[in-house]
Amino acid sequence: MAKCLYCYKELNGNERDFHKACSKKIFGTLEAPILPYTHNNLNDLARQVIRSQTTLTGVQAKLSLDINKGSKNEPGRFTIVGLWGRYILKPQTERFGNLPELEDLTMHLAEIAKIRVVPHSLIRFEDGELCYITRRIDRTNEGGKLAMEDMCQLSEKLTEQKYKGSYEQIAKLVLRYSSAPKLDLVNFWEQVVFSWITGNADMHLKNFSLYSPQQEVYTLTPAYDMLSTALVMPEDTEELALTLNGKKRKLRKADFVMSMRASGLDEKVIENLFKKLLKVETKWMEFISLSFLPEEMQISYLSLIHISEPTRLQLI
């Protein structure tokens, strides 16, 4: 069964990789643009990235892309551009298998839990290999830049210090700089708890940001870089990238409650946050089984959330 790379639902007989409506949502056109590269020319791509300075920060390889519009009867084509590109592409990596499929699935799980995320999808190279693609929220349709600062910048730390800090410190920054501090505080803690449940130990200072979607308004960005690191790095004993209640390991619901309470959330809001995540477990199970992950990784993800004793969901 051929499935849509955006929504994972079955395609109609004449559709390839995307429903027209899904392509419109992520790319702005009814027909998805072509990604005219293959895994075999990634080395050439890497050299092009270095020459044109189109690389983006982060451990995982990232390329900055934009769309060259096609003619009336031809689809558009992605091309590597400078840092002003409206899309970010993450190809497969040699070290860890299936990271694009894993990141896209984890972003979908966040959406199922009603957590706002950046626009995202899977897309294929010309040779059929899957990549992860996301549309930048700090760029306008015309390529202009919106103000956006991550928590490394807001806490006046260097990029190499992105693992030096705590989630309580981020909560204080959200309260200080957000135009909707109480709402953004809840949204922030939802991202943190979700990351823990799904085994994401890489939500560091640069993976939370404030941006200005309209003049003189600063708000927490939708979630991005959501990835279950526990599935690809099972040897890592840390459960979070930053400290929570003074620790990164052996976390329990009480640790989250103490930190959220200290940041200013009341008990009812905290309990509702946990309930919101608990009630989507069945939907998560169903969606994982629809994903593009290999079956063995699907089973591992299901086990992380549901089967292992005790699961992180059971601990909340």
Predicted regions and their residues:
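C-terminal hydrophobic structural anchor segments
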Residues: L231-K276
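Conserved kinase catalytic-core segment
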Residues: E94-I112, S166-V232
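ATP-dependent phospho-/nucleotidyl transfer catalytic cores
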Residues: E126-D127, C131-I197, L242-G246, M258, ...
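Conserved ATP-binding subdomain of kinase catalytic cores across diverse folds
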Residues: L42-K162
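TRNA-binding/sensing appendages of the translation machinery
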Residues: M1-H39
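A residue-level signal for conserved active-site and pocket-lining positions in enzyme catalytic cores
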Residues: L65, A110, M151, D202, ...
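C-terminal reverse transcriptase regions that engage the nucleic-acid substrate
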Residues: W189, V193, K275, T282, ...
